[in-house]
Amino acid sequence: MAHRLLVNVIFTGASVFGRAFTEAYKQAAKATASTPQGGAAKSTSVGGIPTDEALKILDLKKTDLSVAKIDEKYAYLFDVNSKDKGNSFYLQSKVYYAMDSLRKELDYLDKLKKTKDGSQGEAGPTST
């Protein structure tokens, strides 16, 4: 009798777990399919830190973003948060990844601008 009850509990649990797993998989697949792929509206850079967060870490604005400003803020914050001065490696790594993320974002935007300018130049009016 106990053997039959134990087998029944195991099969019922496996059935419930199987249904929950398939439902979770369906939801994850639907969520993945509905997310936008890349483009200028992407919120994360190639490095993984969202661009907005990287701007906040380095205290920069999107309007005055340049490699020189990124390098200036990075050098200052990396030095201030050095382990030799009693600060943490964690903060230094956040500053580094923010700088890396913003540089990759600038490279991406430059490439996008160049391809856009190149395609507009080719599609211009032709004179014969």
UniProtKB/Swiss-Prot annotation:
GO molecular function, one term: protein domain specific binding
GO CC terms in record: PAM complex, Tim23 associated import motor
Region (J-like): 53-107
Broad class of where this protein is predominantly found: mitochondrion
Location of the protein in the cell: Mitochondrion inner membrane
GO biological process: protein import into mitochondrial matrix
Swiss-Prot/TrEMBL keywords: Membrane, Mitochondrion, Mitochondrion inner membrane, Protein transport, Translocation, Transport
InterPro entries found in the cross-reference section: J_dom_sf (IPR036869), Tim16 (IPR005341)
Membrane topology: Peripheral membrane protein
Record family assignment: Belongs to the TIM16/PAM16 family.
Known partners and oligomeric status: Heterodimer with PAM18. Component of the PAM complex, at least composed of mtHsp70, MGE1, TIM44, PAM16, PAM17 and PAM18.
Its job: Essential component of the PAM complex, a complex required for the translocation of transit peptide-containing proteins from the inner membrane into the mitochondrial matrix in an ATP-dependent manner. In the complex, it is required to regulate activity of mtHSP70 (SSC1) via its interaction with PAM18/TIM14. May act by positioning PAM18/TIM14 in juxtaposition to mtHSP70 at the translocon to maximize ATPase stimulation.
Protein name (database record): Mitochondrial import inner membrane translocase subunit TIM16
Organism, as annotated: Debaryomyces hansenii (strain ATCC 36239 / CBS 767 / BCRC 21394 / JCM 1990 / NBRC 0083 / IGC 2968)
Gene (name only): PAM16
